[in-house]
């Protein structure tokens, strides 16, 4: 009898747990905390990039190490990577085209701004899609060095230009908080992970950068800079108004980031936002990445 009671209680708990998960998007919507819509909310998979990253890691091999960096052969090509950085997490994002596929992907001949280039995973994606020129913007010295080594031929050919600054709403300098995992490096001290080092990095606005480089146009902006997106976009108003680029923005860093980013972009020019993959935090559902298409 005791065993039967235990099995019954276990079944009740399992039933309630299943329906709690099933009903979460509805509850989130009723509370006004679902920015993805009920249908898209069911695609929110915790740690999806870790799952895909593990698959890519199993198909990759370490070629050599030098100066605290590692050279990896991966299904997406060779990449230099700082030791301790989760390379395969970001490669998984490109593997599933997290920053845009179909009409939201980089197009042949595009001039691309990669804001938050990290070690160059999206640089490779943009070049593979046929980009004419990729401006890799990465202020962290060790990550920038990886871009320099990985894309030495493309840099020499003029298809990639490396800018070792952080995009912001004004010029100057600012502290950047570095972690053992370079994915967490940020101007906004927001991670629970211990800070390994603090460095001072130069700041530049996107509008100034475009003018200094003499770019004839900007066709695509990808931005994933760990919560600094709103300030960086405030410094891109002229570029957005003038060139109306396709924009792909990481909006996963806080539940309110999607609304703030959308407001800034729409204040600059008419755009249609489209949710990419959905993510969740407690009862909040919001887009991991949002695609903005000029109208």
Q: Whereabouts are the PLM-identified features?
A:
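Phosphate/nucleotide-binding beta-alpha loop and adjacent structural elements of enzyme active sites
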Residues: 1-295
């Amino acid at each position: 009898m005791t065993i039967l009671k235990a099995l019954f209680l276990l079944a009740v708990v399992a039933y309630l747990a299943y329906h709690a998960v099933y009903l979460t998007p509805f509850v989130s919507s009723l509370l006004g905390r679902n920015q993805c819509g009920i249908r898209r909310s069911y695609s929110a998979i915790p740690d999806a990039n870790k799952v895909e990253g593990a698959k890519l890691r199993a198909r990759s091999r370490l070629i050599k190490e030098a100066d605290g960096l590692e050279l990896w052969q991966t299904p997406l090509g060779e990449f230099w990577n700082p030791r301790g950085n989760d390379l395969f997490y970001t490669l998984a994002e490109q593997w599933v085209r997290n920053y845009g596929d179909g009409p939201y992907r980089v197009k042949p001949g595009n001039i691309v701004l990669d804001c938050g280039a990290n070690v160059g995973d999206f640089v490779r994606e943009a070049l593979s899609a046929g980009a004419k020129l990729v401006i890799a913007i990465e202020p962290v010295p060790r990550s920038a060095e990886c871009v320099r080594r990985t894309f030495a031929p493309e840099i020499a050919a003029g298809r990639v230009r490396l800018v070792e600054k952080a995009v912001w709403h004004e010029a100057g300098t600012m502290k950047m908080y570095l972690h053992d995992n370079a994915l967490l490096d940020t101007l906004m001290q927001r991670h629970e992970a211990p800070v390994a080092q603090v460095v001072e990095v130069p700041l530049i606005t996107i509008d100034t950068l475009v003018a200094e480089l003499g770019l004839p146009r900007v066709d695509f902006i990808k931005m994933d800079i760990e919560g600094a997106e709103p300030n960086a976009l405030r410094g891109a108003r002229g570029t957005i108004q003038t060139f109306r680029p396709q924009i792909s923005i990481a909006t996963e860093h806080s539940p309110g980031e999607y609304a703030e980013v959308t407001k800034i972009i729409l204040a600059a020019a008419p755009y249609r936002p489209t949710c990419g993959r959905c993510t969740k935090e407690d009862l909040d559902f919001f887009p991991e990445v949002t695609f903005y298409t000029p109208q």
